[in-house]
Amino acid sequence: AQSQSNVTYGEITSVHGHDAFLLEFEQLEVLLAGIFKPQAAVAKVQVLKFGGTSLANGEGLSKVIEIVGAKKAAQQPIALVVSARDNATDQLERLLALASQGQDYHPALDFFKAQQTTPLKEPILAHDFEQLSQILAGVALIKDYSEKTKDQVLSFGELIAAKTLVYLLSQQGLGAQLLDTRALIKTNSDFGNASVKDALSKKAVLSAYEALEPQIIPVFTGFIAANEKGETTTLGRNGSNYSAALIASFLDAGELQNFTHVDGIYTADPNLVPEAEKIAALSYSEANELANFGATILHAKTIIPLIEKNIPLRILNTFKADNE
């Protein structure tokens, strides 16, 4: 099926082994819906992943709201996955460094708070800021921190981004709900670069998604997860793209759209090589090879969940409406 451009396929997960297709009627009905009801194939959810630059104050957030509004106006089912806003992850890492070195981190913390609350008219982040302050105070006291503590601190970047986007969408009449992936994506306890437990995670993501009202837009936090004790873990640097690919796979999405500040994938870094050309289309194997060789727009683990479900990945520029 993967080798044929006009063929798609889906998996049936079951405890019934090879006879699953005879017993899992509901899953089979979903897979066959696109054949007997062609309009059902069109209605597949699109997963939209927004990077940090897209969620920055000013034009970035405005463009994201426009994109989401246009999708809803077209009655396209969507699910959103967000990274930390702008350079929030770097700021949080710096706060940890300052606190652990016994330096005064409060001015940097105040700057972080001001930057994150700029687009908001209500104090919806007060609890998050209080929790962050308490953790930093503890780090300053012992002048050290573990990878577990670092994951806790970094998680505020994605949590704040998701809460901010939910608030702004709601202000525009677009009902949205935060889905905190720490309650959904389960991992081992390898803090800083945790491995996902696919079966547990898929079950939790599907359950949360299917419980939403039809018109509600789910906003998933990228990058963060939790072990089975409920302790916060992260999926590695740039792991938000991996989160988006996992969620697209779990939801059997029609497409994963990665919105960023560049037009797509180029033959070389256009910032370093002015003659670099945009690549119109790549096979999964080519994209995976690029990821393994360090293409920054891709995460090396991102491609595999998409290959397994034959889900296209489209790289789009948030700031160019005609970008394809």
PLM features: residue spans?
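Nucleotide/pyrophosphate-binding catalytic subdomain
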Residues: A41-I303
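Internal nucleotide-binding/catalytic subdomain
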Residues: E255-Q257, I315, K320
